[in-house]
UniProtKB/Swiss-Prot annotation:
Chain spans, region Required for DVL/RTFL small polypeptide activity: 108-139
Protein name as catalogued: Small polypeptide DEVIL 18
Mode of membrane association: Single-pass membrane protein
Functional note: Small polypeptide acting as a regulatory molecule which coordinates cellular responses required for differentiation, growth and development, probably by restricting polar cell proliferation in lateral organs and coordinating socket cell recruitment and differentiation at trichome sites.
Annotated keywords: Cell membrane, Developmental protein, Membrane, Transmembrane, Transmembrane helix
Organism: Arabidopsis thaliana (Mouse-ear cress)
Organism classification: Eukaryota, Viridiplantae, Streptophyta, Embryophyta, Tracheophyta
Subcellular location: Cell membrane
Gene from which the chain derives: DVL18
Compositional bias ranges of the Low complexity kind: 30-58
Amino acid sequence: MDDENLWKVVKKDSIFETTHFSSKPVFTRSFSTKTSSSSSKPVFTRSFSTKPTSYSSSEPIFRRSFSAKPTSSKSPFLSRSGSTKCPVDTSSTSKCSISRSLSQKGASVTRKCRNMAKEHKSRFYIMKRCVLMLVCWHKHACDS
């Protein structure tokens, strides 16, 4: 393979479809905007999947999807989910599956962040008062 052909293959190599000298894409990403039937506002969806060329299965190992759907309020609700499937043995059909929904954990994460911010603010206030007290005490000790 000469340099010109190699450059053409590398030039085709992009973040959205990576060939790596293979006819099947290893990494694909797609975007689409849809208008929901209930409202005229567009819904943004994004999906991402990887397919290793060494496995014979046509099912992707890792899938991630995002969608933003407008609710009855003015702010859009962002829903994010992820799932991972990993083959235990390439010859068998048994696979381990891990899935989670981040929108369910959003409330607990927000609560934890809010509590940490309050705690940080109270610690800063206590330290500020202690430093102020020491400065005033030192000032009165020097004046006497």
